Amino acid sequence: MTNIRKTHPLMKIVNNAFIDLPAPSNISSWWNFGSLLGICLILQILTGLFLAMHYTSDTMTAFSSVTHICRDVNYGWIIRYMHANGASMFFICLFLHVGRGLYYGSYTFLETWNIGVILLFATMATAFMGYVLPWGQMSFWGATVITNLLSAIPYIGTNLVEWIWGGFSVDKATLTRFFAFHFILPFIIAALAMVHLLFLHETGSNNPTGISSDADKIPFHPYYTIKDILGALLLILALMLLVLFAPDLLGDPDNYTPANPLNTPPHIKPEWYFLFAYAILRSIPNKLGGVLALVLSILILVLMPLLHTSKQRSMMFRPISQCVFWILVADLLTLTWIGGQPVEHPYIIIGQLASIMYFLLILVVMPTASTIENNLLKW
């Protein structure tokens, strides 16, 4: 009798994706983050669902409904903080996942990579809209500042902003639609993630060497299922340490003050995972220029396959490119720090230098380093 998992139409899909999938024998822990992102997404959808049962998307009651969740709903506080800090864990995994792709040349899987970039944009949009929902000071002013950036678009800008707001300022209509979008987007992300996997399984996984591993494959189960479970346990441990011991560590104290359109907070800044992009935005004195730089800072990932000049796929055996990569990581950390600082000397100039360096490293230094390595190896 043939096995049901190999014959049943639904089980066959699961089997080919998670059980009998041929996987390279040498993929390291950097390959764990895909499954961790899946776990983060499921966790966010579940906690978000329970939060939505008690949340009201009205400007008069939104803030107090979140307070009610934390005070009166059974285990509401843990659901709320798991959702808020779950977003941080989500972005940590996302950044490491993208970094892994850059380091090991996974961007040569074009469809998988491009859908990944779309996923990154969708996740950033979801997180931004979710941050607006508690309707604290930083929620309101963050929404005002970021949506206002669209007014920099020539000719249609002002109309576009008012269309998104549903009025002449961030108000009830804005909050309601942000809640609607925040609810639907994670399901779109889940669908996109399945397409992401579909394209990945067309080619098979990359591995640290960047060399074809067709000659040496092992079944995904039990080898990588057990490895993913270990990763998941560590992820949940990190998340619960954050939730139970320092739930407000990554948040902004201003968001515990109800939104007040008449009182601007001294320093408007987004959540930590957007600070690098926010620093790039602020480092350009022109509004439209800043918005373009902001979008390009993420969209530049699409160009990675075109900028790949090396004869080798991975950076594993390319010391010069490795140095450039880690300088880029340091630059992004610098930008993250600058994004959280006030707009004054010396932070302005540091931010501008770090922003220039970010684009230079990706567009000029990395391809040059690759070409130098090719020449050194007489290729």
UniProtKB/Swiss-Prot annotation:
Q: What residue ranges are annotated as transmembrane?
A: 33-53, 77-98, 113-133, 178-198, 226-246, 288-308, 320-340, 347-367
Q: How does it sit in the membrane?
A: Multi-pass membrane protein
- The UniProt record gives the binding positions of heme b b562 as 83, 182
Which InterPro entries does the record cross-reference, listed alphabetically? Cyt_b/b6_C (IPR005798), Cyt_b/b6_C_sf (IPR036150), Cyt_b/b6_N (IPR005797), Cytb/b6-like_sf (IPR027387), Cytochrome_b (IPR030689), Cytochrome_b_C_euk/bac (IPR048260), Cytochrome_b_N_euk/bac (IPR048259), Di-haem_cyt_TM (IPR016174)
The residues that the entry says bind a ubiquinone are 201
Residues binding heme b b566:
97, 196
* Classification via SUPFAM superfamilies: a domain/subunit of cytochrome bc1 complex (Ubiquinol-cytochrome c reductase) (SSF81648), Transmembrane di-heme cytochromes (SSF81342)
Fetch the CDD domains from UniProt.
cytochrome_b_C, Cytochrome_b_N
Keywords from the named record? Electron transport, Heme, Iron, Membrane, Metal-binding, Mitochondrion, Mitochondrion inner membrane, Respiratory chain, Transmembrane, Transmembrane helix, Transport, Ubiquinone
Q: Which cofactor does it need?
A: heme b
Protein's UniProt keywords contain Membrane: yes
GO biological process terms on file: mitochondrial electron transport, ubiquinol to cytochrome c
Pfam (any one): Cytochrome_B
Q: Name one GO molecular function term.
A: ubiquinol-cytochrome-c reductase activity
Q: Where in the cell is it found?
A: Mitochondrion inner membrane
On cofactor binding, the record's note says:
Binds 2 heme b groups non-covalently.
Q: Name the GO cellular-component terms.
A: mitochondrial inner membrane; respiratory chain complex III
UniProt function note: Component of the ubiquinol-cytochrome c reductase complex (complex III or cytochrome b-c1 complex) that is part of the mitochondrial respiratory chain. The b-c1 complex mediates electron transfer from ubiquinol to cytochrome c. Contributes to the generation of a proton gradient across the mitochondrial membrane that is then used for ATP synthesis.
Q: What else is known?
A: Heme 1 (or BL or b562) is low-potential and absorbs at about 562 nm, and heme 2 (or BH or b566) is high-potential and absorbs at about 566 nm.
Protein family per UniProt: Belongs to the cytochrome b family.
Q: How does it assemble?
A: The cytochrome bc1 complex contains 11 subunits: 3 respiratory subunits (MT-CYB, CYC1 and UQCRFS1), 2 core proteins (UQCRC1 and UQCRC2) and 6 low-molecular weight proteins (UQCRH/QCR6, UQCRB/QCR7, UQCRQ/QCR8, UQCR10/QCR9, UQCR11/QCR10 and a cleavage product of UQCRFS1). This cytochrome bc1 complex then forms a dimer.
Stated name of the protein: Cytochrome b
Species this protein is from:
Damaliscus pygargus (Bontebok)
